[in-house]
Amino acid sequence: MGEMGKAMGLLISGTLVYYHCAYRNATLLSLFSDVFIVLLCSLAILGLLFRQLNVSVPVDPLEWQISQDTASNIVARLANTVGAAEGVLRVAATGHDKRLFVKVVICLYFLSALGRLISGVTVAYAGLCLFCLSMLCQTSQSLGNCVLKRGNGQILEQEAHSDT
């Protein structure tokens, strides 16, 4: 799936989560429960249908496992992110870097004020929208550069043929 497909899928999923949590005033736990109930019922109906049609579906549990390297990579990335955030906060708290301290304090005050004005779900959804927008812009820029290169190549080829 391309970057644009990932961004659109993420945006659609985020919109559904935002609707469920913000407008229905439901919790995230309620959303996960609803999703698992729908998946369980759908799988049960498909199982009954396949049994009725005498279709055998092989279930290989090894296909659903991730490798140990993948699991280690996920944990290492999470640990690096938490470690980097902890390092920034430690340097800011000691006061060795005054500019970093001021930036952290301003960001924390801004987030505190934002949290009092609007709900956390709205902030998370706005962040998701901005993230998807940046993914779409990066994809469109790379497509634009590709088109420009092709266009310039065709123009250069036409000029070369017209000179001869």
Curated annotation (Swiss-Prot):
Membrane topology: Multi-pass membrane protein
Residue span(s) of domain Reticulon: 1-164
Keyword Cell division belongs to the record: no
Subcellular location: Endoplasmic reticulum membrane
Gene name per UniProt: RTNLB22
InterPro entries: Reticulon, RTNLB22/23
Taxonomic lineage of the native organism: Eukaryota, Viridiplantae, Streptophyta, Embryophyta, Tracheophyta
Keywords: Endoplasmic reticulum, Membrane, Transmembrane, Transmembrane helix
Pfam families in UniProt: Reticulon
Protein name (record): Reticulon-like protein B22
Top-level taxon: Eukaryota
Gene Ontology cellular component terms for the protein in this record: endoplasmic reticulum membrane
Source organism of the structure: Arabidopsis thaliana (Mouse-ear cress)
Keyword Transmembrane: yes
